[in-house]
Curated annotation (Swiss-Prot):
HAMAP family: RemA. Pfam families: RemA-like (PF04025). Belongs to the RemA family. It comes from Natranaerobius thermophilus (strain ATCC BAA-1301 / DSM 18059 / JW/NM-WN-LF). InterPro entries: RemA-like. This is Putative regulatory protein Nther_1328.
Length: 89
C-alpha cells in the first residue's frame, strides 16, 4: 500500500488515505466540529491567516482548516489517484 498525498494549499500536504470528509465550513454542525477540535487540541490551521474555505476531517479525528475550496481539494485528490492508476497500467 502506497501513501497518497494531497495538497490542501500553501504547500500543506495531507495523507489522502486518512481523509474522511472535505466539507464547507459555513454550516452550524461543521462550526461545532471545528470548535470541538480546537478544544481537544486536534485542530490544524493550514490557512496561513486567510479565510477558511474547506474543513478536512480525518480518520484520527483531526480537523484541518484549509484556505482552498473543497471542490479544488477534491479535484487534486482525484487527479492524484488517476495518475497512480495510469502508472500501474
Amino acid at each position: 500500500m502506497s501513501i497518497k498525498l494531497v495538497n490542501i494549499g500553501f504547500g500543506n500536504i495531507v495523507s489522502a488515505n486518512r481523509i474522511v470528509a472535505i466539507v464547507s465550513p459555513e454550516s452550524a454542525p461543521i462550526k461545532r466540529i471545528v470548535t470541538e477540535g480546537r478544544d481537544r487540541g486536534m485542530l490544524i490551521d493550514a490557512t496561513y491567516g486567510r479565510r477558511t474555505r474547506a474543513v478536512v476531517i480525518t480518520d484520527s479525528d483531526h480537523v484541518i482548516l484549509s484556505a482552498v475550496q473543497p471542490e479544488t481539494v477534491k479535484q487534486r485528490l482525484h487527479t492524484d489517484s488517476s495518475e497512480d492508476d495510469e502508472e500501474i497500467n
